[in-house]
Regions:
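Extracellular beta-strand/loop-rich repeat segments of large surface/secreted proteins
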Residues: 457-539, 545
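Subtilisin-like serine protease catalytic core
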Residues: 37, 58, 71-107, 112-174, ...
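Outer-membrane translocation/initiation segment of Type V secreted surface proteins
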Residues: 32-33, 335, 347-397, 401-403, ...
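Outer membrane beta-barrel transmembrane domains
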Residues: 750, 829, 840-945
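Outer membrane beta-barrel translocator domains of Type V secretion systems
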Residues: 617-814, 822, 924-945
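Substrate-binding/access-modulating region of protease and related hydrolase catalytic domains
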Residues: 23-35, 79-80, 136, 156-259, ...
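Extracellular S/T/G-rich loop segment that most often corresponds to the catalytic His/Ser-adjacent loop
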Residues: 89, 97, 247-327, 331, ...
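Extracellular repeat-rich scaffold modules on cell surfaces
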Residues: 305-308, 315-316, 320-331, 379-450, ...
């Protein structure tokens, strides 16, 4: 983190020597205390040499937090992080334990000949002020108001206190104050809050007001910063001249600094033991009452080393509490400008003293717990809430009063929760204004038209939110949540091009006056658990007075949550408007989709039929998931994606992979026999890799199948060979399984016997084995994706015969062959877990397949290189497989698992180039292609040892 000490142009000597800490006037001196650590009693406070006449009582360690209700901000996780506070004071000790790592820069503006610039803060006042604003907890001390804020120090106060000119107000000056460079440096570090716990200066010549205001204007007006000034410690009825700068008069009765009020706060002090009482030393708010509030003036803070604790008093120590609070509000609402931060702190202050804004306490006592919940008063005209689209959780929960109105701008959402009674109008220019959990507005609401009405409007969300006034809708009114009764206690006008956005199952908009409608309706999903039935009615508007006009555009649906499976038409009478809902046939909507999607549509249609006849089931998790499915958007493609996810085709493809793996083992043994026929010396123990590309052991399915087979050859007469083999294959299906994940493990044993007659041969095989299967799938139900899983297994047996003739020799051969095979697979029942009942279940299944085979194997060797190729045609002899039926787990809705039935005929082709490198290294490059059924291909380059 950057830390700098910079020497800036020194303030005018006479001016610098006149500045005093503690906001001017009398103020306390640091008094050391011990932390409250029972059972050791704290020592008594040693009296100063010359005790002041009205010294306050020593405060508790957490008085500055307790009296200001700062614990609420801590509970909300607010620390002021991301906000920088400028401490214009006697300097800030950069290595102070409470501030360590967060003092970004130390600027010096005092005379090095008269002051010790080798120490960041000789007086210690600025460090104490910074600790109260932004210090982290140290030992028994609980920390300052905004312990995550960063500090920039501007040292303008000399090491020795000045002498008063006899006026009791400090020292007078005329002309510019000389702080313009201070402000520019703070701006360069993006300081948003400038704390001024100093005073001791005043002026009497009227032109000076404009000159001083000009020095503050860049920080307040151009930069958008907030100035916090201590009122002073003279016990007067008015704050110091500088503190009340926006109210100071200029030439000819003008107020040349009045524009600074938008970014200016004055801090007076109360007794922490009697927060309704002005501290005896504190200047009252006086003419600054409109931008003044109070905070405790007595506070405990740690020394720079963190080993000792001190307490002091003065408006100097009230000001940093307000500065820290400003940092918390800015963190909570980063889109606020300086004026709205100021208004929020003032408008949420606790009223003390005379009712309302008074000349003693201004707006009252700082209440951080309320301030972090947004504005409390609109006393300064209309409030513009420019909530950007990136802002989240922007909730104003105070009951807002005052004469101003609200203007909603920016693409983000602003939520009002309170019972608001501000008198001005409400204007929604952009973005969404949401009345949540019974929030109330007592004003007319105007919603401006936008090219994209979905992004702008008034939302009723939860409970009984109300607008007590008329609503003119040029974009959208939103009713999209359950348990919400949105009410307009006045008239409702929906203009052409505007819309009422509603969720099916939501309550209608209630209008106590008259409703005049145009525009249209936009359906935004469904209230959770609601499944529309044929002929259902969705109420839109109920007007207690009368309803006139009609919607001029057909009802539409929103993007990813638009309805694909429900159609609607409008209905009206003299007081009501509604939608007539008709359930769209899922099977009809899916008529142009894939076979697997159509099978899923049949299953979904059956489930909807069960739901329509069982109101109790509609309120279940299955009913809620069915409602989500009806939210499916994205047009035909969105519907296709959802149905495909529900089809369960991964089960069918995994079953097909089992058959292909059995065929892969058959071809591996046939290839082994072919090699032994060419070179009888190879007879004996052998091992072969399964799943290698281009080598005849390609499964030909959409899964990645790998495995091994090992066997032992035995002689059978003079021309015969028999053997036994064992093997294992593992298949993994990913994206080719429709986005699902499948894992099969298959173990088998094979018995084979073959005979040769010259170059001709005959080979018979018998095998059996078992498999285990794990499938994990994703279901698309509306806008959500939900996982389901199943674990099951099965058994298989197979038999095959093959005859062929080998042409060529050991290094070059070509073998055509004919054959037949028969395979039976018995699969256990399965039941998927998850998916709110939209997972699948299936009974045990048995499939027997027989096929004729015609193929060709070839091989050519050149030194260490070998080229191999194969081609095989497979022709089914039996009819199609019996349908493997599956139903949803939640209801009985059966339909076939599409993609299960094998093609009548298909072909496998492959070629591989292989070379041995050294004694144990092998390089292979291969490609396989299946044609017919689920076309698949595989290419691979591998090096193995």
């Amino acid at each position: 983190m950057e830390r700098t000490t910079m020497m800036r142009s020194v303030l005018a000597t006479a001016l610098a020597l006149s500045l005093t800490a503690c906001g001017g006037g009398g103020g306390g001196s640091n008094v050391r205390i011990d932390p409250p650590a029972p059972p050791v009693p704290p020592p008594t406070t040693p009296p100063p040499t010359t005790p002041p006449p009205a010294k306050p009582q020593e405060p508790t360690f957490d008085a500055h937090l307790a009296v200001t209700n700062a614990r609420a901000a801590q509970a909300a996780g607010l620390t002021g992080q991301g906000v920088r506070i400028g401490i214009v004071d006697s300097g800030v000790q950069r290595n102070a334990v409470a501030l360590n790592g967060r003092v970004l820069a130390n600027f010096n503006y005092i005379d090095p000949a008269r002051n010790n610039l080798g120490v960041d803060d000789v007086v210690g006042h600025g460090t104490a002020v910074a600790s109260l604003a932004a210090g982290a907890a140290v030992g028994s001390w609980p920390g300052g108001i905004a312990p995550g804020a960063q500090i920039v120090s501007a040292r303008i106060i000399s090491d020795k206190p000045p002498t008063d000119d006899g006026s009791g107000q400090g020292n007078s000056f005329s002309g510019p104050l000389g702080v313009a460079q201070v402000h520019q440096d703070l701006i360069s570090y993006n300081v948003k809050v400038m704390n001024n716990s100093w005073g001791g200066l005043y002026w009497t010549d009227l032109p000076t007001t404009a000159q001083v205001a000009a020095e503050y204007r860049p920080f307040v007006i151009s930069h958008g910063g907030l100035v916090v000034f201590a009122a002073g410690n003279d016990g007067r009825s008015e704050p110091s001249s500088l503190a009340a700068l926006p109210s100071q008069k200029g030439v000819a009765g003008s107020l040349p600094a009045a524009d600074l009020e938008r970014g200016w706060l004055v801090a007076t002090a109360v007794d922490p033991y009697a927060p309704g009482t002005l501290a005896s030393y504190a200047n009252a708010c006086g003419q600054a009452a409109r931008y003044c509030l109070a905070a405790p003036g007595s506070a405990v803070y740690p020394d720079a080393g963190g080993g000792s604790y001190y307490w002091n008093y003065g408006t100097s120590f009230a000001a940093p509490l307000i500065s820290g609070a400003a940092a918390l509000v800015w963190q909570r609402f980063p889109y606020f400008d300086n004026n709205l931060v100021r208004q929020t702190l003032l408008g949420t202050a606790k009223d003390i003293g005379a009712p309302g804004v008074d000349p003693v306490f201004g707006y009252g006592l700082l209440d951080i717990g309320r301030a972090i919940n947004g504005p409390g008063r609109f006393d300064w005209g209309d409030v513009v809430a420019n909530v950007d689209a990136g802002s989240t959780n922007s909730i104003w929960s105070n009951d807002i009063t005052g004469g101003g109105g609200l203007v909603k701008q920016g693409g983000g959402k602003l939520v009002l929760v309170g019972n608001n009674s501000y008198a001005g109008a409400t204007r929604i220019e952009r973005g969404i204004l949401s009345l949540q959990n019974g929030g109330v507005i007592r004003s007319n609401v105007t919603i401006l038209g936008q090219p994209d009405p979905d992004s702008t409007g008034l939302q009723f969300n939860g409970g009984t939110p109300r607008v007590i006034g008329d609503v003119t809708n040029g974009s959208s009114v939103f009713l999209t949540t359950a348990n919400t009764t949105g009410t307009i206690e006045g008239n409702y006008t929906q203009q052409a091009g505007a819309q009422l956005m509603i969720a099916l199952g939501a309550n209608a908009l209630q209008v106590t006056g008259n409703a005049k409608i145009d525009g249209g309706v936009r359906v935004h999903g469904m209230v959770t658990g609601y499944v529309p039935q044929n002929g259902a009615r969705q109420d839109l508007i109920h007007a207690a007075g009368s309803l006139s006009g009609t919607f001029s555009t057909p009802a539409t649906s929103t993007g990813l949550q638009g309805l694909s499976l429900v159609s609607s038409t409008y209905g009206y009478d003299s007081k009501n408007a509604w939608l007539n809902l008709t359930q769209v046939s899922v099977t009809a909507a899916a008529s142009g989709l894939s076979t697997s999607a159509q099978a899923a549509a049949q299953r979904v249609q059956g489930a909807f039929a069960v739901l329509d006849g069982n109101p109790g089931l509609q309120g279940s998790q299955f009913g809620a998931a069915a409602a989500a499915l009806q939210w499916t958007g994205g047009g035909q493609q969105g519907l296709a994606d959802s149905l495909q996810s529900l089809s369960g085709q991964a089960h069918a493809r995994a079953e097909a992979a089992t058959f292909d793996s059995i065929d892969m083992s058959r071809r591996a043994i046939a290839e082994r026999f072919d090699r032994v026929q060419a070179a009888p010396r190879l007879r004996g123990t052998w091992q072969s890799a399964l799943g290698e590309a281009g080598q005849g052991s390609f499964a030909g399915n959409t899964a990645d199948s790998r495995g091994w087979m090992a066997g032992q050859d035995l002689p059978l007469g003079s021309n015969g060979l028999m053997g036994v083999a064992f093997g294992e294959t593992r298949s993994n299906g990913g994206s080719s399984f429709g986005g699902d994940r499948g894992r099969d493990r298959q173990a088998q044993a094979q018995l084979y016997a073959g005979w040769t007659l010259g170059r001709g041969y005959a080979l018979a095989q018998f095998g059996s084995g078992q498999f285990t299967r794990a499938l994990d799938r994703q279901l698309l139900l509306g806008a959500g994706a939900y996982g389901v899983s199943a674990r099951y297994g099965g058994r298989f047996s197979s038999a095959s015969v093959e005859g062929g003739y080998r042409f060529g020799r050991a290094g070059a051969s070509l073998t055509p062959y004919l054959g037949a095979s028969s395979t039976r697979v018995d699969t256990d029942a399965f039941n998927e877990l998850g998916g709110f009942g939209f997972g699948l279940r299936g009974d045990a299944n048995r499939v027997q397949r027989s096929q004729m085979l015609a193929g060709l194997r070839g091989e050519r060797a050149w030194g260490r290189w070998t080229l191999r190729g194969h081609a095989e045609w497979q022709q089914r002899l039996d009819g199609r497989d019996a349908d493997w039926q599956a139903s949803f787990v939640g209801v009985d809705a059966w339909a076939p698992l599409a993609g299960w039935d094998a093609p009548r005929g298909s072909a496998l082709f492959g070629v591989a180039l292989e070379s041995w490198w050294g004694r144990n290294g092998r390089l292979s490059l291969g490609f396989d292609q299946r044609v017919g059924g689920n076309d698949a291909r595989q290419a691979a380059l591998r090096y193995s040892t």
